[in-house]
Amino acid sequence: MQYGAAAAEQAWYMPAAAMVVAAAAETAAERVERLASESAVVVFSVSSCCMCHAVKRLFCGMGVHPAVHELDLDPRGRDLERALARLVGAGGAAAAAVPVVFIGGKLVGAMDRVMAAHINGSLVPLLKEAGALWL
């Protein structure tokens, strides 16, 4: 499946039913990869998770407005949670898998990694490199 400009060029003539079938054929891992690359900062979250709320507030407080994907509101959210748990090494424990943050399309990790990067000063350069911060 193609993404980005190539997909947009082809989408104009693809029937809606074919787009739905193509989206359904996309695996959870492929969907995570696609969503993670669509914005400078992407947060996979669960709306009732306090750690997810904290990481979103951290970014907003820095002037960064991430793309947030609330997995509990997504019909395929459970599959995405499992794929994210595998990515961050949570051993399939979906509760431990969120929040998951991508910056510049690259996996930063869960809350512990984001906070460690913030504390050690490496978060701001990552955000600048991804184009999420200008100052």
Swiss-Prot record:
Keywords: Cytoplasm, Disulfide bond, Electron transport, Nucleus, Redox-active center, Transport. The gene is GRXC5. SUPFAM superfamilies: Thioredoxin-like. Belongs to the glutaredoxin family. CC-type subfamily. Residues 29-134 form the Glutaredoxin domain. It holds the Pfam family Glutaredoxin. It comes from the Eukaryota. This is Glutaredoxin-C5. GO terms for cellular component: cytoplasm; nucleus. Disulfide bonds join C49-C52. A motif (Responsive for interaction with TGA factors) lies at residues 132-135. InterPro entries: GlrX-like_pln_2, Glutaredoxin, Thioredoxin-like_sf. Has a glutathione-disulfide oxidoreductase activity in the presence of NADPH and glutathione reductase. Reduces low molecular weight disulfides and proteins.
